[in-house]
Structure formats: C-alpha cells, structure tokens
Amino acid sequence: MENELNLRDEQMNFIKEYLKAMKGFSKETYNHIIDVSQLALSMAENAGLGATETKELYIGALLHDIGKLQIPSEVLHKPKLTNEEFDLIKTHSQKGYDVLGNLFNENIKNLVINHHEKPNGRGYPRGLTNDQLSESDKILAVCDVTSALQLPRCYKEGMPADKIAEILTESAEKGDLDAKYVNLMINTYLNPLIEKQNQEKEEQYVLKLTR
C-alpha cells in the first residue's frame, strides 16, 4: 500500500492507526470502509480516472467515515434514531474533514466532507449541487450507498443485488445520486452479482428437488 500510494510516513501511520481504532470501535463501520474503498478502486478503473484521481479517491474512501469515531457508539449502532440523534450522526462528515487538518490535501478532505452531498442539492452538510461536486465525489457517494445497502448491520440484513440496483436507480431518478455512476455500478458490479445470486438460487432449488 505504501509504495502504490506514495504516502508520507505520517499519513500512512495516521491511516493505519485510524483503521485500527475504527475496527475496535465499530466492526460494522470498519467493514463498510473496506468495502467502499474496494468499490471505489473498481469504479475508478471502470470510469477511466487518472492515477492521481484514483489514489485520492481510494484514500478518501478509506477516510470517509473517520468522523464516526466522534459519534457515541450507542447512537451509531441504534436501529431507529430520533431526529436529534440523526442530526448528530450527520455531523460525522464535517467532523471527519476537520480532524484531517493539514495532513491530507483538499481533494481528499473534500471527499470526506462531501460523501453525503447529492446532485440535487438535498445532501449534507453543505447542500452542494451537481456542478459543485467532483467526479470522485459522485463516485464515492454511489459506492457508499451501495455498500450501506449490501452489508448486514446489527439491525438489518444485507440486501440482494437486484434490490440494490432498484434502489440506486430510484435514487438517480430523484437526483440523489449521479445517474452515470449509478449505471456504471449496476453494469460493472451489480449485474454480474445478480447473475451469480440467481444461479445460486437455482442450484439451491435443484438441490431441494433431488433430496
């Protein structure tokens, strides 16, 4: 990882310590972070991003939920939130941006603060609109939602790929996510997964018939 990303020692140590802390604080969030970073790498390649943009997107994906370390665990893992608790959760993107200080460049910090922004301007914390978001911002938002739907949490099961594709499509139609990158996620990641899951269902059905 060091050689590929050409990070300074202090940056590398920061990321390692942060991931270790997150794994101890919230295994679910840690799993989500790793999942999002892998999805982001794949999307960057499929979208044809350059080497620098890909590196920054990957680092931003790893760091995007760092602000959740400042959210009480009982709130972070609560199935149903009050309005006040949800408002507290929503502060994590700003907190993440702030905690990075001058250690990472503005492109990476913007990925952290912007991952809940929406092209239609209804996101948080700043209510940015499509023209104010970078391509990497838009990709990370799609990866974040995909992973959140896909992975199980203590209060919910993970969704099958076909349902995730349906929700992403609806979100793109409403302007909550970028349509181009939703289509890319569906075509390159979810459709092959749907095919695999359908095949597994068929195999399980055949097994039941032969018992």
Annotate each predicted stretch with a short phrase.
Residues E2-R211:
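Histidine- and acidic-residue-rich, metal-dependent catalytic cores
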